[in-house]
Amino acid sequence: MAQAGRTGYDNREIVMKYIHYKLSQRGYEWDVGDVDAAPLGAAPTPGIFSFQPESNPTPAVHRDMAARTSPLRPIVATTGPTLSPVPPVVHLTLRRAGDDFSRRYRRDFAEMSSQLHLTPFTARGRFATVVEELFRDGVNWGRIVAFFEFGGVMCVESVNREMSPLVDNIALWMTEYLNRHLHTWIQDNGGWDAFVELYGPSVRPLFDFSWLSLKTLLSLALVGACITLGTYLGHK
């Protein structure tokens, strides 16, 4: 596989296509448009639901409420360094890893979905609290996969609760977090190419992932207006 160089691949593309995949598994068709046509390093372009599941669309006044009530800083679109297109095998390997993870912890994810209590006012705070806890003790590939699965759960739950505009916000927050907090670790550990080489279909089954042999604490506790997700404990 061709190396992407120090700058790596476009995290925005990885996020958008992963969310599209997770929503399509539930029968929701989220059209992300031509991801590759957007300026590399820019903020994600909003997606469009070709099948709009909500009978009462979220009022426009609420669509930006999550961003305004979040402890995270708003993302600013920039024209950063040139990034390499993401090879299809990266998307495929990440999808397989996410599916394997969700199968192993199906009951936990179902419980998490029922306790998220997402609203346009709370969504970004929920996201920030969970992600902070997830990476509190460090980064590894297992936690990165869990990060993508959690984002997918939030998107599906948003559509289920007739708040589909939140999906675009969640994609933005995920891209922002990857760029600001995970990109350096990913590059220092061989980039997404290393992820594929370590855990791709031609190497070993996903069920043999050492970081999926988790002593998992996937518990949700509501404390006031915040939600805490126990860290997915894993090892590289």
Curated annotation (Swiss-Prot):
A motif (BH3) lies at residues 90-104. CDD domains: Bcl-2_like (cd06845). A motif (BH2) lies at residues 184-199. It is found in: Mitochondrion outer membrane; Nucleus membrane; Endoplasmic reticulum membrane; Cytoplasm. One of its GO terms (biological process) is negative regulation of extrinsic apoptotic signaling pathway in absence of ligand. It holds the Pfam family Bcl-2. The modification Phosphothreonine is found at residue 69. It is a single-pass membrane protein. A motif (BH1) lies at residues 133-152. Keywords: Apoptosis, Autophagy, Cytoplasm, Endoplasmic reticulum, Membrane, Mitochondrion, Mitochondrion outer membrane, Nucleus, Phosphoprotein, Transmembrane, Transmembrane helix, Ubl conjugation. The keyword Membrane applies. A motif (BH4) lies at residues 10-30. InterPro entries: Apop_reg_Bcl2, Bcl-2-like_sf, Bcl-2_BH1-3, Bcl-2_fam, Bcl2-like, Bcl2/BclX, Bcl2_BH1_motif_CS, Bcl2_BH2_motif_CS. Gene3D superfamilies: Blc2-like. The record marks 64-65 as: Cleavage. Its main location: mitochondrion. The chain crosses the membrane at residues 209-230. GO terms for cellular component: BAD-BCL-2 complex; cytosol; endoplasmic reticulum membrane; mitochondrial outer membrane; myelin sheath; nuclear membrane; pore complex. The modification Phosphoserine is found at residues 70, 84. SUPFAM superfamilies: Bcl-2 inhibitors of programmed cell death (SSF56854). Suppresses apoptosis in a variety of cell systems including factor-dependent lymphohematopoietic and neural cells. Regulates cell death by controlling the mitochondrial membrane permeability. Appears to function in a feedback loop system with caspases. Inhibits caspase activity either by preventing the release of cytochrome c from the mitochondria and/or by binding to the apoptosis-activating factor (APAF-1). Also acts as an inhibitor of autophagy: interacts with BECN1 and AMBRA1 during non-starvation conditions and inhibits their autophagy function. Forms homodimers, and heterodimers with BAX, BAD, BAK and Bcl-X(L). Heterodimerization with BAX requires intact BH1 and BH2 motifs, and is necessary for anti-apoptotic activity. Component of the complex, at least composed of LRPPRC, BECN1 and BCL2; the interactions prevent BECN1 from forming an autophagy-inducing complex with PIK3C3. Interacts with EI24. Also interacts with APAF1, BBC3, BCL2L1, BNIPL, MRPL41 and TP53BP2. Binding to FKBP8 seems to target BCL2 to the mitochondria and probably interferes with the binding of BCL2 to its targets. Interacts with BAG1 in an ATP-dependent manner. This is Apoptosis regulator Bcl-2.
